[in-house]
């Protein structure tokens, strides 16, 4: 089974993916490292640009029939049996990305993406089985337990569990309104 764990940067993907793979006894694969090692991703300033079509091809060829947890911001674009979309309050995303040294522009882009469900919408366009999990206020262990419960129950789709639209006023300070 291929499980993809995606979400806005700062939602907790890597921590949760590693713990989930450990709990399931699955192989852990970083999409970023996979792309760089296969020459389908390149560093451009402080980002990595990945050819998503090539990434999907590599995943299909190398991981089909294997038990793998794919960790990465773009993992919802590759063939997977189930896609887990991790969500976190936009303010929490902002705090985490600020601590990582993200530029104001990149921080704003990611806070806005979380506010308006960008990753969730992309995942739903690409995949049949999408499970949305809110990580806000939960330990990584609690998040993994929730994911395991959803997987064991056979839940096919769980979306719409978060709505950050009411949170706009609380995170507007992180957005670059009117800035170029």
Curated annotation (Swiss-Prot):
It comes from the Archaea. InterPro entries: Adenyl_kinase_AK6, P-loop_NTPase. One of its GO terms (molecular function) is ATP hydrolysis activity. Keywords: ATP-binding, Kinase, Nucleotide-binding, Ribosome biogenesis, rRNA processing, Transferase. ATP binds at residues 10, 12-15, 100, 138. It catalyses: AMP + ATP = 2 ADP; ATP + H2O = ADP + phosphate + H(+). The keyword Nucleotide-binding applies. GO terms for biological process: ribosomal small subunit biogenesis; rRNA processing. Gene3D superfamilies: P-loop containing nucleotide triphosphate hydrolases. Residues 30-50 are annotated as: NMP. Its EC number is 2.7.4.3. Belongs to the adenylate kinase family. AK6 subfamily. Interacts with uS11. Not a structural component of 40S pre-ribosomes, but transiently interacts with them by binding to uS11. This is Putative adenylate kinase. It comes from Thermococcus onnurineus (strain NA1).
